[in-house]
Amino acid sequence: MRVTQGCFSFLPDLSDDQIKQQVSYAMSKGWAVSVEWTDDPHPRNSYWELWGLPLFDVKDPAAVMYELAECRKVNPEGYIKINAFDASIGTESCVMSFIVQRPITEPGFYLERNEIHGRNIQYTISSYAVQARPSGDRY
């Protein structure tokens, strides 16, 4: 099951040249770029691990591509995404985010159903990867 989070998630994976073009676009807008990774792809897991520091004031996409390459070396089977943050007054938010690497196999999610008080049914989704292995050993 292909995880679909962020921009371009329904398109084929971006090449490094396409990633660099998106980073250049973000930098041309004055947005700060950061690299994040995770091994827990749950849709509500919006706080991924930050790789290094956000690249504030960096104007060269090559620096971001270097950090991405280093993150890929350390996390060869994890999810990696690039975020762009607009710090301008009135926005102050993540304005672009897209996955740049994913595991070769993505096991997907399962639906858990629990009966709670008053015969109410509570549903939640969980990742097969998270259930099967501890953090850091999932892919």
Curated annotation (Swiss-Prot):
Any one GO BP annotation for this protein: reductive pentose-phosphate cycle
HAMAP family with a match to the protein in the record: RuBisCO_S_bact
Keywords per UniProt: Calvin cycle, Carbon dioxide fixation, Chloroplast, Photorespiration, Photosynthesis, Plastid
Localization: Plastid, Chloroplast
Gene Ontology MF, one: ribulose-bisphosphate carboxylase activity
Annotated organism of origin: Ectocarpus siliculosus (Brown alga)
Record function comment: RuBisCO catalyzes two reactions: the carboxylation of D-ribulose 1,5-bisphosphate, the primary event in carbon dioxide fixation, as well as the oxidative fragmentation of the pentose substrate in the photorespiration process. Both reactions occur simultaneously and in competition at the same active site. Although the small subunit is not catalytic it is essential for maximal activity.
Lineage of origin: Eukaryota, Sar, Stramenopiles, Ochrophyta, PX clade
GO CC annotation: chloroplast
SMART domains per UniProt: RuBisCO_small
Name of this protein: Ribulose bisphosphate carboxylase small subunit
UniProt cross-references to Gene3D superfamilies, sorted A to Z: Ribulose bisphosphate carboxylase, small subunit
Subunit architecture: Heterohexadecamer of 8 large and 8 small subunits.
Keyword Plastid: yes
Main location group: plastid
Family named by the database record: Belongs to the RuBisCO small chain family.
Miscellaneous section: The basic functional RuBisCO is composed of a large chain homodimer in a 'head-to-tail' conformation. In form I RuBisCO this homodimer is arranged in a barrel-like tetramer with the small subunits forming a tetrameric 'cap' on each end of the 'barrel'.
